[in-house]
């Protein structure tokens, strides 16, 4: 005599392997996500090494600017000082002793990644030090000073506007009825359809 559940195995005894899931390897993060994580860890390390050590919750826009200035020592962009004979030259003919700094574009991208990382790690958007007005002003000043020093104007990208569509208004009362064609009633002439 066979029991009703003889085809089933007992999960308590362990002879049922259970549902089989094919585990896929964890998805590799995008280049942006990897860079954002590295930047975030670098900033946290900076706060840890700060004298005195600084908690993230007490971090302000001033600390972010201090961090950006600290990063200048690792920069690779030659920024001429006002007294340099090559100030304002894009392609100086010979080397000079002007400092290397972080390029404005690199700092701007870094702040964007850190702003996102701050909120992803539990920070409130209204207290985000990377979104502080002082940081935006600092970045604008860096952009303008580097543009002058390197002779490279930074211009905002102009948005392409969609082509304008010209509408033609047809006046039915002034349509041609002179040729007697009933199909031509209300149809504009070519001259009427083209705007002046």
UniProtKB/Swiss-Prot annotation:
Organism domain of life: Eukaryota
Motif Nuclear localization signal, residue numbers: 156-160
The entry's keywords: Developmental protein, DNA-binding, Nucleus, Transcription, Transcription regulation
GO molecular function: DNA binding
Residues annotated as domain ALOG: 31-158
Biased composition regions of type Basic and acidic residues, renumbered to the chain: 1-16
GO biological process, one term: mRNA transcription
Region (Disordered): 1-36, 149-196
GO CC annotations on file: nucleus
Keyword match Zinc: no
Record has Nucleus as a keyword: yes
Pfam families on file: ALOG_dom (PF04852)
Matches recorded under PROSITE patterns: ALOG
Annotated compartments: Nucleus
Stated family: Belongs to the plant homeotic and developmental regulators ALOG protein family.
Function: Probable transcription regulator that acts as a developmental regulator by promoting cell growth in response to light.
Listed name of the protein: Protein LIGHT-DEPENDENT SHORT HYPOCOTYLS 6
Lineage: Eukaryota, Viridiplantae, Streptophyta, Embryophyta, Tracheophyta
């Amino acid at each position: 005599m066979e029991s009703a559940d003889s085809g089933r195995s007992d999960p308590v005894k362990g002879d049922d392997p259970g549902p089989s899931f094919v585990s896929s390897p964890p998805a590799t993060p995008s280049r942006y996500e990897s860079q954002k994580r590295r930047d975030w860890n670098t900033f946290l390390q900076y706060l840890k090494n700060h004298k005195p050590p600084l908690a993230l919750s007490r971090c302000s826009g001033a600390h972010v600017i201090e961090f950006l200035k600290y990063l200048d020592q690792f920069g690779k962009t030659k920024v001429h000082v006002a007294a340099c004979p090559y100030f304002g030259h894009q392609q100086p003919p010979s080397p000079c002793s002007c400092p290397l700094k972080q390029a404005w574009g690199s700092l701007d991208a870094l702040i964007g990644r850190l702003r996102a990382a701050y909120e992803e790690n539990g920070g409130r958007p209204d207290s985000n030090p990377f979104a502080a007005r002082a940081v935006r002003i600092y970045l604008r000043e860096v952009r303008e000073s580097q543009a002058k020093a390197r002779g490279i104007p930074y211009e905002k990208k102009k948005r392409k506007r969609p082509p304008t569509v010209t509408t033609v208004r047809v006046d039915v009362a002034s349509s041609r009825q002179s040729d007697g064609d009933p199909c031509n009633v209300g149809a504009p002439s070519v001259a009427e359809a083209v705007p002046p």
